[in-house]
């Protein structure tokens, strides 16, 4: 469950990190079906409102939550973002799923204090709910010395070249959950 970073925004269908994850699972002889419930532009509030129906419909063993970036870009209250992430993790766990939370960072123009608080919210949710966490989903992309090579012209959405890196950021932590 995610936003445009997982919904293949601006990419050729089948080239995003979630599609690459399905291929990786097959290569590893792990028979899991991946359901991409990501919507471009989604916030944690949107994800929270959709999650119960998705859990009921798909009855997943694992839920990856990649949300929060749009909350930050829209300047939504941090407490609301954290509460929504916490609620989603709890709901997924109550439905019997293991949760993997993908952390994000705020753009630097929001100031260092807000950026630290935003990043800390993901750690707090993971600690409170005892979920797995990828601290920064865009590690090696958003913090690359030459980040423009990894982004579409809008400088927000990772391009096709970044997708394998995004999967590489998720895979080690997810693989531990799948065993």
Residue ranges and their predicted role:
Residues 10, 35-43, 72-76, 155:
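Acidic/histidine-rich helix-loop elements
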Residues 15, 43-44, 135-136:
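A short linear-motif detector with a strong N-terminal bias
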Residues 1-40, 50-59:
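Serine-esterase "nucleophile elbow" of acetyl-processing enzymes
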Residues 30, 48-179:
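Alpha-helical cap/lid subdomain in secreted, periplasmic
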Residues 6, 43-44, 81:
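Ser/Thr-centric signal marking residues that sit
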């Amino acid at each position: 469950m995610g936003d445009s970073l997982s919904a293949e925004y601006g990419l050729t269908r089948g080239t995003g990190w979630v599609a690459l994850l399905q291929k990786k699972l097959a290569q590893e002889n792990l028979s899991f079906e991946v359901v991409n419930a990501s919507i471009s532009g989604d916030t944690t509030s949107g994800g929270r409102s959709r999650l119960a129906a998705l859990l009921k419909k798909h009855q997943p063993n694992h839920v990856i939550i990649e949300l929060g970036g749009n909350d930050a870009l829209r300047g939504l209250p941090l407490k609301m973002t954290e509460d929504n992430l916490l609620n989603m993790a709890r709901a997924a766990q109550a439905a019997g799923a293991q949760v993997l939370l993908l952390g994000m960072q705020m753009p630097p123009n929001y100031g260092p204090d807000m950026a630290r608080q935003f990043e800390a919210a993901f750690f707090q949710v993971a600690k409170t709910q005892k979920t797995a966490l990828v601290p920064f989903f865009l590690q090696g992309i958003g913090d690359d010395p030459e980040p423009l090579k990894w982004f579409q012209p809008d400088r927000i959405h990772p391009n096709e070249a970044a997708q394998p890196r995004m999967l590489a950021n998720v895979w080690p932590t997810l693989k531990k959950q799948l065993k």
